[in-house]
């Protein structure tokens, strides 16, 4: 399971420094690729394996302030599709989880501010934030026999946020 994310910049795509853009891509994309590429040879040898990348709903939504982060998370979704096609014949499955706002250290600034939290919860049909166990449960399913015919997919777990108009 790959779960890498940094976002040192909030603002317009016109203003992001190259160093911030590079850091986002290095951590959020390249590190996932490296980890998968280290694991895949052993999976090929045993003709079995599961790759899971934790992405974000940012990868399927546009953003005025999180553009580079969103680009990196969309890339995660494409990585699993490519790995699924390339390594599926070796019985290696690759899938992605795209969480909405989950109560984690990474999202602390979004949920500790009462106004921001209220805004996010009111924009979510379930009217709450997600719990890390809800993401972990999806990863367990993907890695278990219950997920044995699932590959190349992105599972959105966001309390319904992305279905809102």
Question: Model segments located where?
Answer:
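Active-site loop immediately N-terminal to the catalytic Tyr-X3-Lys motif
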Residues: 14, 61-67, 89-90, 127, ...
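Active-site helix of classical SDR
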Residues: 36, 72, 80
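Residue(s) in the substrate-gating loop at a strand-loop-helix junction
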Residues: 56
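Short C-terminal tail/terminal secondary-structure segment
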Residues: 10, 61, 140, 151-165
